[in-house]
Amino acid sequence: MSGIASACLSCLSTVDRWCHITACLGPIGGRSRDGIYETTLADNEREAVSDLLGYLENRAETDFFRGEPLSALSTLVYSDNVDLQRSASLTFAEITERDVREVDRDTLEPILFLLQSSDIEVQRAASAALGNLAVNADNKVLIVALGGLAPLIRQMMSPNVEVQCNAVGCITNLATHEDNKAKIARSGALGPLIRLAKSKDMRVQRNATGALLNMTHSDDNRQQLVNAGAIPVLVQLLSSSDVDVQYYCTTALSNIAVDASNRKRLAQTESRLVQSLVHLMDSSTPKVQCQAALALRNLASDEKYQLEIVRAKGLPPLLRLLQSSYLPLILSAVACIRNISIHPLNESPIIDAGFLKPLVDLLGSTDNEEIQCHAISTLRNLAASSDRNKELVLQAGAVQKCKDLVLKVPLSVQSEMTAAIAVLALSDELKPHLLNLGVFDVLIPLTESESIEVQGNSAAALGNLSSKVGDYSIFVRDWADPNGGIHGYLKRFLASGDPTFQHIAIWTLLQLLESEDKRLISYIAKSDDVVHMVKSISDKNIESDEEDQEDGEGEVIALARRCLEFLGNGPRQTLVEA
C-alpha cells in the first residue's frame, strides 16, 4: 500500500530539487550578487549551512541520517529562520526519496518538528519526507510512538491540496501496520480522512480512500469507521472514474460487509450498492472485478442479498468471471455464486443461467483447493431442493467427475464431494444411475478416511443409496470388496462407539434387510460380527428419565431391534420404568 502516496510525494520532483536546495542555501551561506548579506544568521547556523552545502556536493557518499550531516540539518530545522527550515525540509524530502531505511528518533524528531511549522512549503516537504520514511515497517511504529499523528491530522485539514495529499499519503502508509491501526482509529483521523475522500483532487482522493481501506482489517476499526460515516462516501465513490479509487472503495466495502451488523446497515441505507457492484464486475480492470465479486460474496452471507444479486442481473457477469483464465477472478466468482446458491429460490435461476457445466469443469481444471470446494459446494446447493435439479446436476457430469477425482483431492474437497453425492442419492430416481456409475468404488474406501467428515458423508451416501433402490445386485457384489466392502463398513461403524456412526450403520442395515434380496439378507445373517454388535446395541438399557439419550441412543436401539426382528432374533424388553 506504500505506493498509494507516490502521486503526492513526487510532487516536488518537478524541479531538480538538489539544485533548488543549493540555490536556496547559497545566498544564506555567503554573499549575494550585489555583495550584501541578505540574511543574518547565528554563527552555528552559518556553519551548518556551509557544512550542508559541502555534504550536498558529495551527497552520493554522505549519510544524512546520522553524525555531522544530521546535526547540520537539525540546526537548520530548529532555526527561527523559515528559509533554513524550508531548505532542511526539502533536503529531508529528497534524501528520503532515494534512501529509505530504518531510522531512529534523532532523525524523526526534526521532521516531526517541521510538520508543526505554519509555512506551507515546510509542511509540504516535511510530510513528504515522513511519508517516504513510513514505507519502512519499523519507522511506521516509531513515527506514531513519537506523536506523529496529531500534526499529520492538522495537515489533513490544511487548505493547501499538496499538504493534504502528503499528509494523507503518510497516514495511509502508517495504517498498513497492525500496531498503528487502532491508534489511528482513536486519534481523530477518520473524520478528516472521510472528508478528504470526497476531495476534487484525485491524488488526495486516492490516498484518503487507501487509508480508509487500511482501517477495515479489524472488527473494532471497521465499527469506528462505520460510526464515523464512511459507508455513504465509499458507496458513492464506487462510481468514480479512477480505477484505484474504485478498487480501494470496493475492497473497503467488502471488508465492512464481513460483519452482520454492517450488512444490516448497508441493506437499510444503500439501495444502489448491489447494482454498483454488479456493474463493477464488468470493469476492464481485473482487481476491481475481483473485489466487486468478493464484496457481493460477503453481502450474500445474508438471505436478502442472495436474492437481490440475482434480481440485479448479477449472474451473467459472475458466469463470465467464472470462465476467466485468471485464477483470482475465478476464485472470487465461485465463492460468490456458492453463497448465492444457498437460497432455494436461486437454484433454478443459477442452473438456467448456464453455471452447471463450468462448475463441473472447475473440479478438474484446477488443483486450487478453495476453488474446488466452492464449486462442488455450489453444485450440492443447486441439487438440494428438487429432483429436477438433482438430475440436471447429474447430467452435467458432476458425479462422474467426483468419482474420478475424489480419491486424489485434499480432505476438504473430499468432504464436499461426498456430501454432494449424499444429497444426490436422496432422489429415488437417480439411485440406479449413481450405482451404475460405480460410486461404491470410492464411497466404501472413504468410510475409512482419516477425516471424520469424509467418513460420515460417505456412509450417509451409502445409506441413502441403500433405501428403496429396487435392484440390490451391486450391494451383493460389493458385500466384501473393495476395502472390506459393505460388510467392512458396517462392522467399523457399529464398533466405533459413536452414536451418529452407529445410527447411520444400523439404519443402512435395516434398509438392506428390507430389500427382500435373499442373497443380501443371507450375507448379513452369516456375518456373525455384525449381528453380534447389533444384538449388543439392542440389549442396552435406557432409563426413561434420560431424555437426552432417548432422542439419539434410544432411536439407535429401536433400529437395532427392528434389524433383529428381520433376522429372526426378537429383542428382549429392556426398558426400565422409572
Swiss-Prot record:
Q: Which Pfam families match?
A: Arm
Indicate whether Secreted appears among the record's keywords: no
Q: How is this protein positioned relative to the membrane? A: Lipid-anchor
Q: Which locations, inside or outside the cell, does it occupy?
A: Vacuole membrane
Metal-binding keyword on record: no
Source domain of life is: Eukaryota
**BP GO annotations:** establishment of organelle localization; nucleus-vacuole junction assembly; pexophagy; piecemeal microautophagy of the nucleus; protein localization to membrane raft; protein localization to phagophore assembly site; protein-containing complex localization; ribophagy
InterPro entries named in the record = ARM-like, ARM-type_fold, Armadillo, Vac8
Function description: Functions in both vacuole inheritance and protein targeting from the cytoplasm to vacuole.
The protein, known as: Vacuolar protein 8
Q: Which organism is it from?
A: Aspergillus oryzae (strain ATCC 42149 / RIB 40)
